[in-house]
């Protein structure tokens, strides 16, 4: 949930932001490790917490997770390599590879390091089984329905590419190659509510009974929402656990075997820990519309453009002048890209909206809240713009965990 900079008890406050602004070139990301620790503690009832690193894959964030005994999910060869560099062990359940297909290079690496595979297609099982009989596998099941904060984050149902539609068809392949089925996984999308959660839990029970094979784990997947606006309520993690624990117990009784309950949060652990600091570089009027243009674009923060996502915005003035919060104007916030869609105030489908902001000056700073998930990890080099710096606040100090990329580093790839 966004917190006012002058009232927050976190390290993401006015004083620290002003220090960082003086020291580092905007735009840049900032994370507060204390917030991540608190979010981890909310999930301690689950047997296994596995971080969906696609939300924030910085190696230093992964190391922070490992220090707290959090395991990791990887969805690409690059994420496998990140996990290994961060200290997660191969040939164990510390890393699981989740996907709907293998490319040859990734398949080879998964086999070499004996990384368990959460298979989202029958073809994956066939390809893995031929080369690595006995490999540990999960089945990622598409329950036939989905849910998400955006149509683009819905990962269940017949319009989704994710998961195995009929998991019974996987069993002959698993037995043919003597693959070791260790778990069932179900994830229907991001921003799941309790009603959908109960439906997913029941679907997991039905699929486990239908398959009727001994397993060690079930995974609740991810999708735990966070409140991006002031009027949203945080999810009740105890209620979330109870729903899945009931499913686990029913499956355990049916299969007559103990089963561990795993959860795979991404956004929930890191979103509220991060902010994006940007600077106002141009102000102009287009007809009746007021535009404020900043030095960060959708190459940095993609979510508003891709999903129509809302992020609360705070203002820090360059000259410490007092801002009258009641004296606001409707403002469209745009970035520097040569792209009409480079607008931070839009809804899904590209409909432009406004924010009520105080009257700004060139050099003032806009702070985007709750960007620790799918912020830096979704950044690109569009318009040949370098990736920006990432900073971690930890143990009452701050350090760079990714330096600013140089343009020459981009050009050298093409020489």
Swiss-Prot record:
Instruction: Name its GO BP terms in alphabetical order.
Output: lysine biosynthetic process via diaminopimelate
- Please list the residues that bind pyridoxal 5'-phosphate: 223, 264-267, 374
- Family matches, as InterPro entries: Ala_racemase/Decarboxylase_C, DAP_deCOOHase_LysA, De-COase2_C, De-COase2_CS, De-COase2_N, Orn/DAP/Arg_de-COase, PLP-binding_barrel
Q: Where does substrate bind?
A: 267, 303, 307, 339, 374
Q: Which CDD domains match?
A: PLPDE_III_DapDC
Kindly report, in one word, the top-level EC class recorded for this enzyme. Answer: lyase
What does the record give as EC number?
4.1.1.20
Q: Which SUPFAM superfamilies match?
A: Alanine racemase C-terminal domain-like, PLP-binding barrel
Q: Which residues carry this modification: N6-(pyridoxal phosphate)lysine?
A: 54
Q: Which family, according to UniProt?
A: Belongs to the Orn/Lys/Arg decarboxylase class-II family. LysA subfamily.
Protein role? Specifically catalyzes the decarboxylation of meso-diaminopimelate (meso-DAP) to L-lysine.
Among NCBIfam families, the record links this protein to: lysA
Kindly provide the name given to this protein in its UniProt entry.
Diaminopimelate decarboxylase
In which organism is this protein found? Buchnera aphidicola subsp. Schizaphis graminum (strain Sg)
What are the leading ranks of the lineage? Bacteria, Pseudomonadati, Pseudomonadota, Gammaproteobacteria, Enterobacterales
